[in-house]
């Protein structure tokens, strides 16, 4: 009985997360039937469970079906925490060894991509880690085995190839970071780079 109860609890949590992040949502029913980001996460959970149990081909086929239906590609090997939300998710790509903590939010067009290292074999971590509470703006590309620290924000269209410490604002091409508190204070004062 624990399985179905846990499943219903997670679905409710996902819907509540979508409502909290999207002020345009009108109802839980609307989210349940019409939010592709939520559907992609649900499909990933099934594919990831199959992947972990060794049903790799079935998991990959399911992930490609999920991609076809939602426009969001999440490799079944990716590890994703709770309360993950993808807003307007078309074009999101999450690679095989990506790790996402709890309360992560991605906008459309985000790529969590790999960088192959010469001589690295199968199973080598080559995709980013996003710690808890990270938000990634539309079109951002985070590439390679790097870590974006807890509570950080990655700006739209940033190209990130280096680690960012917790509570950073990460912007630009190539991306630079600074403490999020400093960036927030500058914005309040009307100071721009």
Regions found by a protein language model. Give the residues of each.
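Terminal amphipathic alpha-helical/low-complexity segments used for targeting or macromolecular assembly
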Residues: 1-70, 183-193
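Residue-level signal for alpha-helical context at structural boundaries
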Residues: 29, 33, 64-65, 98, ...
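Short glycine-enriched, charge-decorated loop/helix-capping segments at active-site entrances
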Residues: 46, 120-121
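Left-handed beta-helix
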Residues: 70, 75-76, 81-82, 87-96, ...
């Amino acid at each position: 009985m624990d399985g179905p109860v846990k499943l219903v609890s997670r679905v409710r949590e996902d819907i509540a997360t979508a409502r909290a992040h999207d002020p345009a949502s009108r109802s839980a029913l609307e989210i349940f039937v019409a939010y592709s980001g939520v559907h992609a996460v649900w499909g990933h959970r099934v594919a990831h469970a199959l992947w972990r149990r060794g049903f790799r081909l079935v998991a990959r086929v399911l992930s490609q079906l999920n991609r076809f239906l939602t426009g969001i590609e999440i490799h079944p090997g990716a590890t994703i925490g709770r309360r993950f939300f993808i807003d307007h998710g078309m074009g999101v790509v999450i690679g095989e060894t990506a790790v996402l903590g709890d309360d992560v939010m991605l906008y459309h067009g985000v790529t969590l991509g790999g960088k192959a290292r010469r001589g690295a074999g199968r199973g080598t971590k080559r995709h980013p880690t996003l710690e808890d509470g990270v938000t990634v703006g539309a079109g951002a590309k985070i590439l390679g085995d790097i870590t974006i620290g807890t509570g950080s924000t990655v700006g739209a269209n940033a190209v990130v190839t280096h680690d960012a410490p917790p509570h950073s604002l990460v912007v630009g091409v190539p991306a630079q970071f600074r403490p999020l508190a400093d960036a927030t204070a500058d914005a309040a004062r009307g100071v721009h780079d």
